[in-house]
């Protein structure tokens, strides 16, 4: 194996500068999948958004012409360990759920959450950015005597089909109010 002291993360320029074949040890190197994923996640998080958007095409996700492509890249690169994970998350976001994660559905979808979602959908207006969506959501929750936990997870289930996603407010900005309303309506139609 080879190392440069305790350093683990290098730019290409640093790697070229520091690497010396004379410093390769005779002991066997080991492969550590967890460390590789950690390192890969670091490079994804620090990648240029436009470069990531181009790389995602190879993984079946073409958001090059999406109006919110940079916001999508920014949200998903913070969570992904691999480009495959990033692409899968974006695919889930951009496609309406055809089914819902059973565990998330049972845990978060109730009569009261469906009622709250229906009222919330009526308050959504076009062209909200994430900050405005968050402010309006908090006003809505205050007016209805509810807490964010009462709305966020059921809304996440409606939008993505599951209980894991980036910020719900960022997701609402990416999809737009009409699409969010449609997804809420689809969940309500499914019912309990």
Describe each PLM feature range.
Residues 13, 33-37, 70, 74, ...:
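Non-catalytic, well-ordered alpha-helical scaffold segments
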């Amino acid at each position: 194996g080879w190392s440069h002291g305790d350093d683990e993360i290098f730019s290409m320029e640093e790697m070229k500068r520091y690497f010396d074949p004379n410093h390769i040890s005779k002991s066997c190197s080991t492969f550590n999948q967890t460390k590789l994923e950690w390192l890969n996640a670091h490079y994804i998080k620090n990648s240029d958004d436009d470069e990531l958007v181009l790389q995602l095409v190879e993984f079946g996700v073409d958001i090059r012409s999406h109006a919110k492509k940079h916001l999508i890249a920014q949200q998903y690169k913070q969570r992904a360990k691999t480009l495959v994970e990033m692409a899968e998350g974006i695919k889930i976001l951009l496609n309406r759920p055809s089914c819902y994660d059973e565990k998330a559905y049972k845990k978060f979808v109730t009569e009261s959450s469906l009622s709250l979602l229906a009222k919330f959908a009526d308050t959504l207006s076009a062209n909200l950015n994430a900050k405005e969506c968050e402010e309006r959501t908090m006003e809505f929750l205050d007016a209805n005597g509810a807490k964010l936990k009462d709305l966020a997870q059921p809304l996440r289930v409606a939008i993505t089909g599951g209980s894991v996603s980036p910020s719900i407010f960022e997701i609402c900005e990416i999809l737009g109010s009409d699409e969010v309303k449609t997804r809420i309506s689809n969940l309500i139609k499914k019912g309990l």
